[in-house]
């Protein structure tokens, strides 16, 4: 099954999007491995890179390849229709779309020819180590 996931969020409403994604990624029980993901952010001026980074983390913890573009996948505008004037942002989105299609086709061909990468059972650890061993 081909699944494409595109996260989009206005910078000011990032926390709302994050709450939805937290629930979606926590409660969904389908394997997201090798499903292509991409994040797109819109802002008046700044803050795109932090939101973009936060949205992409859902993909990286789910074995999902991330489609990229020529720049961070952001577009700028404050009022309705202003993003249409962001020529660099629109070009970034067009390049992203082409790269996503290419990546999805490449993964499909690779899966057909080579299969999916071997998976491992997830191991959960923490960063605390036994202190006694270190002191000896």
Give the role of each language-model region:
Residues 36, 75-80, 131-132:
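Solvent-exposed, flexible loop/coil residues
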Residues 39-41, 59-61, 78-79, 115-119:
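Short alpha-helical linear motifs
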